């Protein structure tokens, strides 16, 4: 993406966080970025096109940052770093964008499908962090997929609490999560969850 377009995307994120969805106008983005409003239309077409590009941009940045952070982790450090990576994601700028866009995305097929694809990226990130999907036998893959789905929900929920309460500290909850995973993950992987059955 050309440098002016990237500059406008960054400006759009700042406007969205500061002014909300209703304040995200082409004029506001042009003023924030220092670019002409016609250029915003040239690169993104309209507000929906801009939002799609913004969703792709922030989630892709998170994905790349996460992959870089986990690429050199040893097996002994993998689970603590996995949980720390979840905590980093829940505090990232993408969630401020996510919270503002979500109510509108639920009513817009184009934005909703973009969000769904972003969630698929996040679930894949979590599987990649554990380096588990390719190495796991078929009997474990359902449990790993369920774990990635559950961890995505945990990140969302803690991010909401952090966003609405400046005094909320996610470290306590993530410490509990790490404690639980250290003790339950081996049992989970040994359980056959195919078809929704639960470990006995």
Which residues fall in each region the model found?
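Amphipathic alpha-helical packing segments from all-alpha helical-bundle domains
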Residues: 64, 68, 90-99, 109-135, ...
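Short helix-capping/turn signature of helix-turn-helix
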Residues: 41-44, 88, 100-107
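Helix-turn-helix
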Residues: 7, 11-49, 53
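Short, basic, alpha-helical segments at the C-terminal edge of helix-turn-helix-like DNA-binding modules
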Residues: 56-62
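Hydrophobic alpha-helical connector segments
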Residues: 53, 64-95, 141-151, 174
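Solvent-exposed, amphipathic alpha-helical segments
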Residues: 11-18, 65, 97, 101, ...
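C-terminal peripheral helix-coil segments that are non-catalytic and often amphipathic
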Residues: 123-131, 154, 160, 164-200
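Residues in soluble alpha-helical coiled-coils and helical-bundle/repeat scaffolds
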Residues: 45-49, 70, 74, 106-110, ...
């Amino acid at each position: 993406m050309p440098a002016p377009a990237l500059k406008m995307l960054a400006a759009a994120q700042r406007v969205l966080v500061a002014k909300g969805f209703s304040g995200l106008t082409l004029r506001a983005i042009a003023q924030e970025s220092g670019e002409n409003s016609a250029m915003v239309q040239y690169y993104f077409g309209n507000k929906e096109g801009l939002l799609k590009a913004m969703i792709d941009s922030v989630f892709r940045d998170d994905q790349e940052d996460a992959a870089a952070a986990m690429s050199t982790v040893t097996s002994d450090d993998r689970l603590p770093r996995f949980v720390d990576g979840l905590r980093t994601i829940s505090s990232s700028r993408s969630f401020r964008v996510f919270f503002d866009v979500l109510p509108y995305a639920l009513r817009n097929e184009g934005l909703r499908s973009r969000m769904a694809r972003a969630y698929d990226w996040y679930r894949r990130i979590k599987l990649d962090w554990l380096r588990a999907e390719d190495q796991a036998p078929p009997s474990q893959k359902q449990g790993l997929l369920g774990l990635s789905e559950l961890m995505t929900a945990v990140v969302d929920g803690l991010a909401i609490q952090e966003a609405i309460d400046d005094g909320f500290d996610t470290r306590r909850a993530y410490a509990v999560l790490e404690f639980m995973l250290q003790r339950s993950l081996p049992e989970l992987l040994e359980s056959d969850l195919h078809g929704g059955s639960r470990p006995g």
